[in-house]
Amino acid sequence: MREALNQGLIDFLKASPTPFHATAALAQRLEAAGYQRLDERETWTTEPNGRYYVTRNDSSIIAFKLGRHSPLQGGIRLVGAHTDSPCLRVKPQPELQRQGFWQLGVEVYGGALLAPWFDRDLSLAGRVTFRRDGKVESQLIDFKLPIAIIPNLAIHLNREANQGWAINAQTELPPILAQFAGDERVDFRAVLTDQLAREHGLNADVVLDYELSFYDTQSAAVIGLNGDFIAGARLDNLLSCYAGLQALLTSETDETCVLVCNDHEEVGSCSACGADGPMLEQTLRRLLPEGDEFVRTIQKSLLVSADNAHGVHPNYAEKHDANHGPKLNAGPVIKVNSNQRYATNSETAGFFRHLCMAQEVPVQSFVVRSDMGCGSTIGPITASHLGVRTVDIGLPTFAMHSIRELCGSHDLAHLVKVLGAFYASHDLP
């Protein structure tokens, strides 16, 4: 089971270079399992034991299976994650022609570790909006091949490179795509038009706009002398999206279960499809009775907010509280913060720990050092919007927000097992 899950994750990561592609990959797997797509613009007709999903902006997705029991009776079991990861996104007018090279101007999305982006074989993917036969359409594209690179400056020309060199995102991050001769002009939108034709057989009249991100073409892999680790891009937080999906598809329950994977977590979640937007609440209100019964159902429900945790790094152990250093391959981490950067409380943490113990899954705790700031997740945002009880958890990870992150190869199976038990649980606290 562990090897199959890990390979499934690797395949999912490869299919998901952007939030758009991740949402499409999740939808494809849901439909293969019998889930029916619902359109937010249409009237919904749902049935007990039905399986459905809905997307917004092509980058956020909510999947749910309705239980045999009324949600008012037993509440809803929700798992939340996010589809986006820090990256380099192409600017609207990106063409740069300098010293005989064609480059694209980029904007840093989220809190990316920038140094690892140098000297990597990069490709480009995302969503393109275009006009065809007088109509405006959108389509996902993925060049797949390594078409760009950001070469480092040789140390001979930058003797401070190993001494805390600050990276200027405006001047040092534009990737190189090609060389050009003389006064030749390169039209990026014409390149996108050609890609639409090659990849989808679409003859676009004009490319109107796009949302495109560079990504590392190196595939994720199980690595280490004993295969102890998984290295790959976008583990934060596609790892949790995939774990939630597998738990939803394999759990057997009479209760209503929901998986929500929001976009824009890395930039604050404040969007129509982010956790700080109305998507989840609007979806639940279409499934549940209004007024008093809606509030009662939410108060009987529980959300597991799943987002990667910081594993204790052997070279930087002092960055962790000495008593709260999560280890790779030692199970999921319950994340706690007294200032509500995480939404965990004693009741929700206790219930998650109870689930882990019942499934013989190891479990750990994390709290940030008292002299350091703490990150956050969709947990507190969703809890404040819905009023739903929440526990923040995640799998220990190294190099979070790097172009290539690292997690334990045993931990995915741990997380899928406990999330499956959560979905199947008959009684919530």
From Swiss-Prot:
Q: Under which EC number(s) is this enzyme classified?
A: 3.4.11.-
> Can you tell which superkingdom this protein's organism belongs to?
Bacteria
Q: What class of enzyme is it?
A: hydrolase
- UniProt keywords, alphabetically: Aminopeptidase, Hydrolase, Metal-binding, Metalloprotease, Protease, Zinc
Cofactor requirements of the protein: Zn(2+)
An individual GO BP term:
proteolysis
Annotated Zn(2+) binding sites: H82, H156, H401
Q: SUPFAM superfamilies from the entry? A: Aminopeptidase/glucanase lid domain, Zn-dependent exopeptidases
Matching InterPro entries:
M18_aminopeptidase_2, Peptidase_M18, Peptidase_M18_dom2
Q: What protein family is recorded?
A: Belongs to the peptidase M18 family.
Please name the NCBIfam families in this protein's record: PRK02813.1
Q: What is this protein called?
A: Probable M18 family aminopeptidase 2
Q: Highest lineage ranks of the organism?
A: Bacteria, Pseudomonadati, Pseudomonadota, Gammaproteobacteria, Pseudomonadales
Gene from which this protein is expressed? apeB
